[in-house]
């Protein structure tokens, strides 16, 4: 399959077989020659331990960006919350559900939700997103099904944390927004009577409104990597990308040195960080905090308590009585910049594609002589204002 045919496939339905062909082509060839790629990029030789260098362009910004054209929310402090046109790409487990609820509570414009396999199967992800939207009274938001597997390795589900359904085993207590059985659905969303793949929709939305869409990648980065392969200009058409994944200190949660989202699809993380020509902010695993949400008797609070019960059982030994915020921190960083307490600016980073204990690790150039081929940079959030995050989360369930 040549690049011309790959681009043409954007106009046609991405069947599972086509998707797999593109994936195989993606990981065995050099990227197209274009200004989004690092000059030092080399084709991936599958099976050979190696590190691909990350080369990302971003504009210079302050640690806490100024609020331009802000929209005021009704949070208690009266602090400003930015309005953004958001697309959330999720592998909807418990933390993704919280992030989606938070985004909908902060008066942002959620244009669409795209689904990728990760915490649970992509079939479950579509259903879980619909459940969250129904609980929030926002079932009109379109949902698109995407990749059901990583680019080059088997999918490793997170059942032990998120439950077999991705929502702590309570999904049957909350109806989906659509009537009927979803088990046999191929995709969600349609154009001219045919299903639309999430990667196609991401490309179309960014192309229609260049510079307007903020993309939140809250699961494995497979859909975004596929979109960048189909359309090398996809990243340039986005306003910015925020990623939940990677690490700073080399601490992992699925491998000694790797975080789940990057470890699930390291090649996809590498593609996004090398080819997306737009500002990128990474919220790594170490930045996660715990926060208590007020006990309120609302539909959203009951939903949150139900889906987090399973996850909290996983953390009983820690003695924590709060919810692990996870993906919701990315939403806070996007819409409430004052929630960010500290960040590393202009970081040069690389994704480790080999390694028995470190595959998927986000490696940093801590001194100027390290990673000399990496010139472009990303912003990495390292800590949050816990009081501000707690305030946002408490308002989330009202």
Give each language-model segment a name.
Residues 7-10, 14:
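Phospho-regulated, proline-rich, acidic Ser/Thr-rich intrinsically disordered regions
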Residues 34-37:
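Cysteine-centered motifs
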Residues 76-131, 139, 171-290:
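Active-site histidine-anchored catalytic micro-motif
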Residues 136-144:
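A glycine-rich helix N-cap at a beta->alpha junction
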Residues 144-176:
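Surface-exposed loop and adjacent secondary-structure segments within mature catalytic domains
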């Amino acid at each position: 399959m040549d690049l011309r045919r790959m681009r043409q496939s954007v106009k046609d339905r991405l069947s599972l077989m086509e998707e797999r062909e593109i994936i195989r082509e993606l990981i065995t060839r050099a990227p197209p020659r274009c200004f989004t790629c690092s000059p030092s990029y080399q084709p991936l030789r599958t099976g050979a331990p190696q590190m691909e260098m990350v080369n990302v362009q971003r504009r210079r910004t302050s640690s806490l960006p100024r609020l331009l054209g802000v929209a005021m929310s009704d949070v208690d402090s009266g602090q400003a919350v930015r309005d953004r046109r958001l697309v959330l790409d999720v592998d909807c487990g418990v933390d993704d559900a919280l992030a989606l609820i938070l985004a909908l509570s902060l008066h942002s414009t959620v244009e669409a939700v795209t689904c990728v396999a990760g915490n649970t199967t992509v079939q479950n992800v579509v259903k879980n997103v619909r459940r969250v939207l129904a609980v929030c009274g926002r079932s009109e938001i379109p949902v698109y099904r995407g990749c059901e597997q990583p680019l080059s390795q088997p999918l490793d589900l997170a059942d032990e944390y998120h439950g077999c359904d991705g929502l702590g085993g309570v999904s049957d207590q909350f109806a989906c927004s659509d009537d009927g059985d979803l088990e046999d659905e191929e995709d969600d969303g349609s154009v001219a009577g045919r299903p639309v793949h999430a990667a196609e929709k991401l490309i179309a939305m960014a192309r229609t409104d260049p510079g307007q869409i903020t993309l939140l990648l809250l699961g494995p980065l497979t859909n975004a990597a596929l979109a960048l392969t189909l359309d090398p200009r996809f990243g340039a058409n986005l306003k910015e990308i925020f990623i939940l994944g990677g690490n700073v200190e080399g601490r992992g949660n699925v491998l000694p040195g790797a975080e789940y989202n990057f470890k699930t699809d390291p090649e996809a993380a590498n593609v996004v960080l090398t080819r997306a020509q737009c500002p990128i902010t990474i919220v790594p695993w170490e930045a996660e905090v715990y926060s208590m949400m007020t006990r309120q008797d609302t539909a959203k609070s009951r939903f949150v308590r139900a889906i987090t019960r399973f996850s909290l059982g996983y953390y009983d030994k820690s003695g924590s009585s709060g919810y692990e915020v996870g993906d919701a921190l990315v939403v806070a960083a996007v819409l409430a910049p004052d929630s960010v307490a500290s960040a590393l600016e202009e970081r040069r980073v690389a994704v480790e594609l080999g390694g028995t204990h470190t595959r998927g690790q986000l490696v940093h150039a801590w001194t100027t002589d390290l990673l000399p081929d990496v010139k472009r940079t990303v912003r990495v959030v390292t800590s949050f204002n816990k009081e501000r995050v707690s305030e946002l989360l408490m308002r989330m369930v009202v």
